[in-house]
Amino acid sequence: METKGYHSLPEGLDMERRWGQVSQAVEHSSLGSTERTDENNYMEIVNVSCVSGAIPNNSTQGSSKEKHELLPCLQQDNNRPGILTSDIKTELESKELSATVAESMGLYMDSVRDADYYEQQNQQRSMSPAKIYQNVEQLVKFYKENGHRPSTLSCVNRPLRSFMSDSVSSVNGGVMRAIVKSPIMCHEKSPSVCSPLNMTSSVCSPAGINSVSSTTASFGSFPVHSPITQGTPLTCSPNVENRGSRSHSPAHASNVGSPLSSPLSSMKSSISSPPSHCSVKSPVSSPNNVTLRSSVSSPANINNSRCSVSSPSNTNNRSTLSSPAASTVGSICSPVNNAFSYTASGTSAGSSTSRDVVPSPDTQEKGAQEVPFPKTEEVESAISNGVTGQLNIVQYIKPEPDGAFSSSCLGGNSKINSDSPFSVPIKQESTKHSCSGTSFKGNPTVNPFPFMDGSYFSFMDDKDYYSLSGILGPPVPGFDGTCEGSGFPVGIKQEPDDGSYYPEASIPSSAIVGVNSGGQSFHYRIGAQGTISLSRSARDQSFQHLSSFPPVNTLVESWKSHGDLSSRRSDGYPVLEYIPENVSSSTLRSVSTGSSRPSKICLVCGDEASGCHYGVVTCGSCKVFFKRAVEGQHNYLCAGRNDCIIDKIRRKNCPACRLQKCLQAGMNLGARKSKKLGKLKGIHEEQPQQQPPPPPPPPQSPEEGTTYIAPAKEPSVNTALVPQLSAISRALTPSPAMVLENIEPEVVYAGYDNSKPDTAENLLSTLNRLAGKQMIQVVKWAKVLPGFKNLPLEDQITLIQYSWMCLSSFALSWRSYKHTNSQFLYFAPDLVFNEEKMHQSAMYELCQGMHQISLQFIRLQLTFEEYTIMKVLLLLSTVPKDGLKSQAAFEEMRTNYIKELRKMVTKCPNNSGQSWQRFYQLTKLLDSMHDLVNDLLEFCFYTFRESQALKVEFPAMLVEIISDQLPKVESGNAKPLYFHRK
């Protein structure tokens, strides 16, 4: 059915005059009206008028006509019998009627208890109209005892939707049930008792608001009035309930089929005292609590439904009860409880907006009788800000059989701000699992795809490129388990920072000193005497008693997985190296036992790595690709800007960028996986005489005649462990020369583009990029250098800034000596300078000077051990004039390495008798490096200043170093340290 509301504006000031002249009468509509049509068959017009003055509470004056006027009449249907209470004359008749009702209520309670025993859950929220009884005389008696005008309630035991009035009279083209003219204002939907100060959206007041409403799904739709003026607006009560007898008690726990919870009430209680809430199924109630098929609430907690009864006490008729804590029909907003998010005005005489009736979830239950309630669709809504007479709501009510909100979650915790200027639309397509009125609290989204386990840590992060102190920073004891994805130099376009393929890390590379290929970090604390202590978790060591000295394999692995070095020597797996000959294979096997091998990631595409191929931990696909690309001498060209993303999915899209990434990762066809593995004697073969013969088996019996000499005393566990510990200690205590040999960086590729012409700017830019990569390796090499970490951080940075050019040129001479026999300058495997390129680079004289150093290596037949110690001495060969912060530690470290070089020269078998001469030659070679480096720095500083004009690129690492070094060198603050006087 439909409900049409018409806007009615105030008719002017004469409305107040006509308001006061209206006679106080209740006009009963006749039953035989012929003006009813099919369209307005179920439409009613409730016109509520109030006199300007309120009638006193204790007024005993008035004629019987006035009493008759205050008794609302319930019109009955022609086809259904009804009880019409027209007049109660004597108190005797009231008592007889009360006794009859009490008896019927007792019978009802017995049946209810029996039914509730079997169907407790279904009966809790049942709205069957067959369980509704009347208690008229109790209400009349209660009003008489309290000195109020008598009011009459009458209802009938019949279905809700059929319990409607057919007696009509035509008013404003609609069907009018009753025109109530009393000093009390009524609500629109089965109106609750109102006061002239408090009115809802469909109350006729002096402002002249008329509303057309239908009470389709209710019974007993009539007002019972008391001359009490309510002090609280209907829509602004502290506890506002919805239709369907959903009560909000202080505990917010009440429904149709169960009593309101209060400290003094109990469930299914048949007797309710004034402070307690009467149960729906309680037939007996005190004079102050009259219950007709509904719950009774105290003045602070009002139970509402379709029809409203207002009195100073608590009276309920399956209806809304308006008391000092007034409540309204339908879904009404209050500052405390709002089930359907409807707005409400203030708590004073301001106007309040009450939406249409929305069924409560407590009115229906699965298995119980369903009562269809109207589903409302808002056509026109208005927002009132305190103006009483300017708000009317037009709504169309559509009776739909499936319009129940049976499973809507209308919890009491749904609190909407009462002064919100917006209202949620009434029409809600709720399902059985929808939650209306509950505030959504968004939880942070959890990533469903967790990060990969941190099996590989890359150190080529931005801090490595842009901050020298970041790499040399002090180690930290712990770090996050995530990984850093930027494992390649600048110029390679990386994946965005979204955790797509490479695990990401929030830890700078400076936090880790050494990392093995499995992802374990090691912090080296190297003393001035060259002894090394390694901090490692006890559970990772195979022998707990070996924690006093570090295994060599950890030192071997410490450099291998640094960024693009990536465990190129030992296949990424821990192995033992440099074990003396006197250590048996059983001892080696026992020491080399470790944990399971962790998974690795390909440095090129991010796929699972299959091993160390061509010096880099890569997958099999990148291994085959690199071999074919280099051996086939393919000149790949990138269709983009040489910055394509190379990953597991897109690695085949651009072979040029893939090859560039392979080269920058450090792949080399000539790379030796294990440069020094198995070189020493006794590693792969053992002398038979070193193996003690196994003892003969003991004789089976004395009669066998064999003699067996048993040991005098079997050694205990502690005594047997001492020689093993001493042997292992000697084996696993490396010398500085061993450490230097194992931490030596691998060869880095320059990433030279053969497709570009060999111009000076291209060659110089390529050399600068190569120098930037090599500087990252130099910094990490110095970080694990024995004794270098004992220096203050500022001293470490100063030494690297002063010696970076010397270290680069000395390493270039060594590579040229080893790979080309000093015929060419071997900058990188993909960048070798011959005479022609030396001229094209605009630095021919400097290239010739570096070539002369390489020729000296041939003349001296320099060994790798000598080269590594000499390189450390070059790191310590230039200091500031003012000295370092820790000059004593620096001098001690330098002296130790000079002694180590002297020992190395003495041990050389080819230099017997000539050790001092060789030592002199080696130190003279170190002195000659200073002159060459001065010329190289002068050229480098010039190109750095004129880089824009010369179009020469400098990487970020070189920019940082040169910017700090240039003013110090030009000011004469750098002081080279010579072995011999000039």
UniProtKB/Swiss-Prot annotation:
- For region Important for coactivator binding, the annotated ranges are 780-783
- Coiled-coil parts of chain: none
Q: Which InterPro entries match?
A: NHR-like_dom_sf, Nucl_hrmn_rcpt_lig-bd, Nuclear_hormone_rcpt_NR3, Znf_hrmn_rcpt, Znf_NHR/GATA
Location(s) in or outside the cell:
Cytoplasm; Nucleus
Which GO molecular-function terms appear in the entry?
Answer: DNA-binding transcription factor activity; sequence-specific DNA binding; steroid binding; zinc ion binding
Q: Which PROSITE patterns match?
A: NR_LBD (PS51843), NUCLEAR_REC_DBD_1 (PS00031), NUCLEAR_REC_DBD_2 (PS51030)
Instruction: Locate the compositionally biased regions of type Pro residues.
Output: 690-701
Q: Which residues bind DNA?
A: 602-667
Q: Does the keyword Ribonucleoprotein apply?
A: no
Residues in NR LBD domain copies? 724-962
In-chain residues carrying the UniProt-annotated modification Phosphoserine: S249, S258, S282, S286, S298
Bias kind Low complexity: ranges: 258-290, 345-354
Q: Where is this region: Disordered?
A: 230-328, 345-375, 683-708
Quick check: keyword Membrane in the entry? no
Using the UniProt record, give the first listed, main subcellular location.
cytoplasm
A matching Pfam family? zf-C4
Database matches in Gene3D superfamilies: Erythroid Transcription Factor GATA-1, subunit A, Retinoid X Receptor
UniProt-annotated binding residues for 21-hydroxyprogesterone: N768, Q774, R815, T943
- GO CC annotations, alphabetized: cytoplasm; nucleoplasm
Q: Where is this region: Modulating?
A: 1-601
Residues at which aldosterone binds: N768, Q774, R815, T943
CDD domains noted in UniProt? NR_DBD_GR_PR (cd07172), NR_LBD_MR (cd07075)
Any domain commentary?
Composed of three domains: a modulating N-terminal domain, a DNA-binding domain and a C-terminal ligand-binding domain.
The text of the family note is:
Belongs to the nuclear hormone receptor family. NR3 subfamily.
* Record-given protein name: Mineralocorticoid receptor
Which organism does this sequence originate in? Answer: Saimiri boliviensis boliviensis (Bolivian squirrel monkey)
High-level lineage: Eukaryota, Metazoa, Chordata, Craniata, Vertebrata
Gene name linked to the record: NR3C2
